[in-house]
C-alpha cells in the first residue's frame, strides 16, 4: 500500500466513524472519557516506559532542554491528563444544543443547533499530552480525529492512542474515531492535506515552519495554532511588586511553552525603578536579556545588546527581549508590528489605560494585571484545549469543546410554503 493509499484509508475510516460518533449519546461519550482516565492510571507504568524510549532517543540526538521538557510525561502531566478526561466528561455536551431560536412572521420557528465539525486532523510536535487533550475534546464534540504527532514522541503517542481506542471500544463507540498516523515520513502530512473529501478541518500545533507548511498545503480549512510572541507592557503607574511577579511567572515558570512571555515593554517613567529589580530576580533564575539601549545599563550582567532579530522572536528558552517605550501608543505600535495575535498583557492601575489596551491590543487573549500563562483552556475554564487559535475565523483563542462544533439552521413549520 502506498503512503497516499494509507492516508486515504485513514480518512475513509475517520469519515465513517464521525458519522457514527455524531449520533452517539452523551452517556456513551462520557463513559469513554471516564474509562480513558482509569486506563491512564492503570497503565501508567507502560506509558512511562514508552516515554522513556522517546526521551533516550531524544537525548542521543541532542534535543535541547525546553523540547525535552515538552516531550516528558512528568507525573504531574499524567495527572493533568487524567483530570482533563474527567473534567471534559463533566462538561455539558454541546451536540444538539440550541444556541438561539426565533419565530418568523409566517410562523416558522428558526433555530441554530450545535453539530460536530466532522473529521479533524491534528498535526502537532513534541508534546505527547496533546494526543489526549485533542482526542478527548474531539470525542466530546462528536468529531473523529486523525492524530499526527512528532516523530520524537512516536512511542509515547502510540501507547496513548492504544488506550484511546480501547476506551472507545469498551464504551461501544467506533475505535476509528481516534486514529494515529504511525509513519514518521513527513510526506504523510502532505497527503493528509489533500484529503478534503474526508477531513473537514486541519489543526497544526507546533513551530512556525509546521504551521506555515500545513496552511499552504491544506485543501480544507485550517485553524492555526501559530507562534506565541507574547508581550507584557508595564505602565507608568503599575504596581511594580505585582508586575515583577507577573513578569517572572510569564518568563520563568515554563519558558518553552507558547504562552510564555517573550518581550517586556516598560514605560520610561518607571524603567529606572523597575528594570534593576527585573534584572536581579530574573537574572538569578538564569534569564538572559536582549536589551534595547535604554534598558541595557539597568538590567545587570545577564543583559546583552538587542539585535533586530530579537524582536518578534519566540525564544522557547530563558531569554527575554526588553524595550523601554515612551507611552502606550509606542507599546501598542510595537505589539501591532511584532506580536503574533496570541497573548498580550498590561500591568497598570489606570482603568482608562487598561480598557484602551483591552480594546486595541490584537490578540486571542488580552489581560490586565495577570500573567500571559493564563491563556490556556484549562485556566480559562474550558477544560483541555486542542490548541490556541491565532486565526480569527471560526475560533480565536483556546479551542475547547464548544469551538470544535459549528451550527446548522433548523426550521419547524406547519405546512408553510414560500410565496
Write out the residue ranges for each language-model feature.
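Rossmann-like NAD(P) dinucleotide-binding subdomain of oxidoreductase/dehydrogenase enzymes
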Residues: 90, 98-241
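Flexible, glycine/charged-enriched surface loops at secondary-structure junctions
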Residues: 24-30, 95, 171-178, 254-260, ...
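N-terminal Rossmann-like NAD(P)+-binding subdomain of aldehyde/semialdehyde dehydrogenases
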Residues: 1-109
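ALDH superfamily catalytic-core signature
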Residues: 126-127, 133-144, 159, 163, ...
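Conserved C-terminal structural/oligomerization subdomain of aldehyde/semialdehyde dehydrogenase
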Residues: 117, 307-419
Amino acid at each position: 500500500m502506498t503512503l497516499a493509499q494509507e492516508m486515504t484509508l485513514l480518512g475513509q475510516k475517520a469519515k465513517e466513524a464521525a458519522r457514527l460518533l455524531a449520533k452517539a449519546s452523551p452517556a456513551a461519550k462520557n463513559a469513554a472519557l471516564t474509562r480513558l482516565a482509569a486506563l491512564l492510571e492503570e497503565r501508567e507504568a507502560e506509558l512511562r516506559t514508552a516515554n522513556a524510549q522517546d526521551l533516550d532517543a531524544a537525548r542521543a540526538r541532542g534535543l535541547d532542554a525546553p523540547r525535552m521538557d515538552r516531550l516528558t510525561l512528568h507525573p504531574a502531566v499524567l495527572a493533568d491528563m487524567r483530570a482533563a478526561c474527567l473534567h471534559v466528561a463533566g462538561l455539558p455536551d454541546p451536540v444538539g444544543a440550541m444556541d438561539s431560536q426565533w419565530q418568523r412572521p409566517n410562523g416558522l420557528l428558526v433555530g441554530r443547533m450545535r453539530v460536530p465539525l466532522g473529521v479533524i486532523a491534528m498535526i502537532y510536535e513534541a508534546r505527547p499530552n496533546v494526543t489526549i487533550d485533542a482526542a478527548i475534546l474531539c470525542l466530546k464534540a462528536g468529531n473523529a480525529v486523525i492524530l499526527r504527532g512528532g516523530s520524537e514522541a512516536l512511542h509515547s503517542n502510540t501507547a496513548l492512542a492504544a488506550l484511546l481506542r480501547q476506551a472507545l471500544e469498551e464504551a461501544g463507540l467506533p475505535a476509528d474515531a481516534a486514529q494515529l498516523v504511525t509513519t514518521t515520513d513527513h510526506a504523510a502530512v502532505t497527503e493528509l492535506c489533500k484529503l478534503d473529501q474526508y477531513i473537514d478541518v486541519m489543526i497544526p500545533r507546533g513551530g512556525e515552519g509546521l504551521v506555515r507548511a500545513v496552511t499552504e498545503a491544506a485543501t480544507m480549512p485550517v485553524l492555526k495554532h501559530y507562534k506565541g510572541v507574547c508581550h507584557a507592557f508595564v505602565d507608568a503607574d503599575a504596581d511594580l511588586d505585582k508586575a515583577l511577579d507577573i513578569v517572572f511567572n510569564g518568563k520563568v515558570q515554563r519558558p518553552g511553552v507558547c504562552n510564555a512571555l517573550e518581550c517586556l515593554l516598560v514605560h520610561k517613567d518607571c524603567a529606572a525603578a523597575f528594570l534593576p529589580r527585573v534584572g536581579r530576580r530574573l537574572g538569578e533564575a538564569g534569564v538572559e536579556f536582549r536589551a534595547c539601549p535604554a534598558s541595557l545599563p539597568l538590567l545587570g550582567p545577564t543583559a546583552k545588546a538587542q539585535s533586530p532579530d530579537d524582536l518578534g522572536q519566540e525564544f522557547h528558552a530563558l531569554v527575554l527581549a526588553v524595550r523601554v517605550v515612551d507611552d502606550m501608543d509606542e507599546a501598542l505600535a510595537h505589539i501591532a508590528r511584532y506580536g503574533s495575535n496570541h497573548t498580550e498583557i498590561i500591568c497598570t492601575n489606570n482603568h482608562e489605560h487598561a480598557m484602551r489596551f483591552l480594546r486595541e491590543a490584537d490578540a486571542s487573549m488580552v489581560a490586565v494585571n495577570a500573567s500571559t500563562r493564563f491563556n490556556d483552556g484549562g485556566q480559562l475554564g474550558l477544560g483541555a484545549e486542542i490548541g490556541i487559535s491565532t486565526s480569527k475565523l471560526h475560533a480565536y483563542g483556546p479551542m475547547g469543546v464548544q469551538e470544535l462544533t459549528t451550527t446548522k439552521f433548523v426550521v419547524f413549520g406547519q405546512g408553510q410554503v414560500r410565496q
